[in-house]
Regions:
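Contiguous, often N-terminal, cationic amphipathic patches that form binding interfaces
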Residues: 1-53, 62, 68-69, 78-97
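C-terminal catalytic core of tyrosine-transesterase DNA break-rejoin enzymes
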Residues: 59
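Short acidic/glycine-enriched loop/turn segments that link adjacent beta-strands
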Residues: 74-76
Length: 97
C-alpha cells in the first residue's frame, strides 16, 4: 500500500490523483500507485492545488509551506513533496482508508 510515495534524502514524494470539484476533501484509496484525493475546490486559478496542499498539511500536521507541488500543476496526476519526518503519518493515512 505504500507504493504511492518514495523517500528521498530529505523529503517524501507522494504520487497523487486529484479529483477536484468534490463534495469534500478526503482520501479515497490507492489506485495505480497513486493516492486518490477528492478536493472540494474547483480546478481553476490554482484553487484545487492550494486546497490539496492545505488538506495534506492539515492531515499530516505540518505547515502549508512544507507541502510543495513538484509536478502536475495543470494535471490531475500530481507529485507533492513533504519533509521526510512525516513519513509515518503518511503511512497511517493508508491504514485509515
Amino acid at each position: 500500500m505504500t507504493d504511492f510515495f518514495r523517500i528521498t534524502n530529505d523529503s517524501v514524494h507522494i504520487e497523487i490523483k486529484a479529483f477536484p470539484n468534490s463534495p469534500k476533501n478526503e482520501f479515497t484509496g490507492v489506485r495505480e500507485n497513486r493516492l486518490c484525493v477528492r478536493i472540494a475546490a474547483p480546478p481553476e486559478d490554482g484553487k484545487a492545488n492550494a486546497c490539496l496542499c492545505g488538506f495534506l498539511a492539515k492531515t499530516l500536521g505540518c505547515a502549508k509551506r512544507d507541502v510543495v507541488l513538484v509536478k502536475g500543476e495543470k494535471s490531475r496526476l500530481k507529485t507533492v513533496a513533504v519533509p521526510v519526518e512525516y513519513v509515518e503519518k503518511l503511512r497511517g493515512i493508508t491504514g485509515d482508508i
